[in-house]
Amino acid sequence: MSMKFTLQHKDPASKARAGELATDHGVIRTPIFMPVGTAATVKGIFHRDVRDEARAQIILANTYHLYMRPGMEIIEKAGGVHRFSTWEGPMLTDSGGFQVFSLAACRKLREEGCHFRSHIDGSKHLFTPESVVDTERTIGADIMMAFDECPPGDAPREYAAKSLALTERWLDRCFDRYHQTEPKYGHYQALFPIVQGCTYPDLRAHAAENVQQYGADGYAIGGLAVGEPTEVMYEMISAVEPYMPKDKIRYLMGVGTPGNILEGVRRGVDLFDCVMPS
């Protein structure tokens, strides 16, 4: 059980790269767009068409929505998300952090984690770094994302700095839990840290340097395309690129219009997702 990214080509005129990410469910050739299957299936299209017509090599499922419905008992009883969804290729789960923090009127942020109410029935729940890693282990995707706070794009610097500090403390707890637990379904699961920092280049650079201590299989850039101008988003990608390991896959979360993908690839990004097409 393992995961390995192999860099195969670099564009001499830009930061663009081509490579392959080997997972236990198949090889992903990058750069690549990842369709969003919120509840582990891309809406309105058969898996065979996602694979053969859309030529998707990996899909994203959402931890928050799977936790809410159908719930972890059903996912685990099915033998993990691959058997539950019948998608045979690689899968990634986000941590649910973006969805939880989108419930601004229904959540309370604390050091321990985030208390929130279900958007379905109003029931109370708590996501902590530990519980999210446990949930993602139960889901069983090839790539798990660390639990982080996703502040708004126009967050004041003081708030952005405090948010980043909290995300970094949570990241320590995520990796502690990750190393304390094992995959449930016989295949390797990677945990990717997320670089935050809002629209402040120095905070972004600090975050990109900090995450390298974990020796992760890949690294993500989060908290963009959340209200900031497009050019500012591109500036933030450029700000973190020099600090991102060259031999690991780079994932730009929640960004995936055709123009955004081209600009992201030019700046050294390998993996993209966006809910708009699905």
Residue ranges: model-predicted function:
Residues 1-184:
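Non-catalytic, usually N-terminal nucleic-acid engagement modules in DNA/RNA processing proteins
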